[in-house]
Amino acid sequence: MRFQTAHTPNSLTEGPIAQTLIAFALPLFLGNLFQQLYNTADSLIVGNFLGSEALAAVSSSGNLIFLMVGLVNGISMGAGVVIARYFGAKDYDRMQKTIHTLLAFGLVAGALLTVIGMTLSPVMLRLMDTPETVLPNSISYFRTYFTGSLAFVLYNICMGILQAVGDSRHPLQYLIISSIVNIALDLLFVGVFHMGVGSAAAATAISQLVSMSLCMIRLMRSDRAYRVNLRKIRFDGRALREILQNGLPAGLQNSIISIANVVVQSNINQFGAAAMAGCGAHSRIEGFGFLPVTCFTMALTTFVSQNLGAKAYDRVKKGIRVGIFCSVTIAETIALLIFIFSPKLIGLFTSDAQSIAFGVMHERTTTPFFFLLAYSHCMAAIFRGAGKSTVPMLVMLLCWCIIRVAYVTFAVKFFPVLRTVSWAYPITWGLSTLVFTLYYFKSDWMHAFEKRERRA
């Protein structure tokens, strides 16, 4: 089969760097904004229609859900680096094999997640010290959410394929459609039919099925080199090794962060449903606020990977400087707005005064340090794009898992207040910033990539 192989429309290897990054990141931002909208719709609608305990049930499931899907999504992210590198090098045969191997992996992983999520949810939620008053709703939400695991995994894979070749416009369109579907179903199931917490998760699962279907149809009907043929979905040994080599560290990084956050959430749970609801509302706000930074780092990963594949090493260095500057500047601007309007923002999710007080305190402790979080994510994106995804995994393991867990385990014993738990985030963001900076300037990662490519 012959494909159109015009390179320029989706390539990040040409054109002014700042404009190229922004043009690619903007649809990513809008797409992720709508994704956050349908994630947040569950919390907003559940909190306002069903009360703070129902909101606590949704919030307590969040970190556990990310733990379950983080490994798979990280592997998909790492595979996107491989696809982007082959796209930059114009090696379309290897790109095709990588794409179809990744889809085969997604089918297996999605099925496994469904089984694990459905069967082990009560055990996992109890291990998190979820209060008994919240537990039934948490189990209902968690189990229903995981009925859509296959669609969720395949959508993220298909979206990653499109983004790896520089197409951030179509994923945006599909996310807008699925977000509208999700919010409409949330209002119908919870607001009109009063079907309970589980129906909010059902709305999310249905909307994910819609976005996955649209994304898959786009890939199957494409005449480009990244076209998907269902008959070619199978495992290729070399492609699978490359996917796991680049993706497994990224997946483990996601899981590492999630494990630490589950421990932090367990400590928050000990302060009761009001603390759970307030901090859960903050996590939704943080998800929105940090979106522009997340999208710049996603763009930076693809930019670095494509340009390294094209051997444009000077362009990589310039792109890194632009990406870090934009990300840090945006992060602190958003942090200031969240800090100022914190009570009103938390109040959107719950009218309970104690929940609002907990949420505002947590928010105003963490947001001033968003620049550290932004910088760390940029560094992780750079090394991931260079195929050195083990570096961010190890940094996150040390700073965001081991040290964070050790801190909350011991600090709360001596200072048993929620603010002590909140400080776990700024402290570990600062440590990861320090470690990443030392490695970036002291190691020879760029030349190591050149040598590896010459050997290949």
Describe each PLM feature range:
Residues A23-D42, T144, Y155, S178, ...:
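Transmembrane helical elements of multi-pass membrane transporters/channels
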Residues S76, T144-Q163, P171-S179, A200-C215, ...:
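Short runs within selected transmembrane alpha-helices of multi-pass transporters and secretion channels
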Residues M1-A25, I83-L150, V192-L248, V304-F369, ...:
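Short alpha-helical transmembrane segments in multi-pass integral membrane proteins
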Residues E14, A18-L37, A41, L64-L71, ...:
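Residue-level signal for short hydrophobic patches within transmembrane helices
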Residues S52-N63, F142, A201, A273-F288, ...:
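Small-residue hotspots at the loop-to-helix junctions and early N-terminal turns
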Residues L55-V115, F152-P171, Q265, G278-S342, ...:
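Small-residue-rich hydrophobic transmembrane alpha-helices
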Residues L28, N32, L44, N48, ...:
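Transmembrane alpha-helix boundary and packing residues in multipass membrane permease domains
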Residues L33, L37-A56, L125-E132, L188-M195, ...:
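Helix-terminus/linker motif at the lipid-water interface of multi-pass membrane proteins
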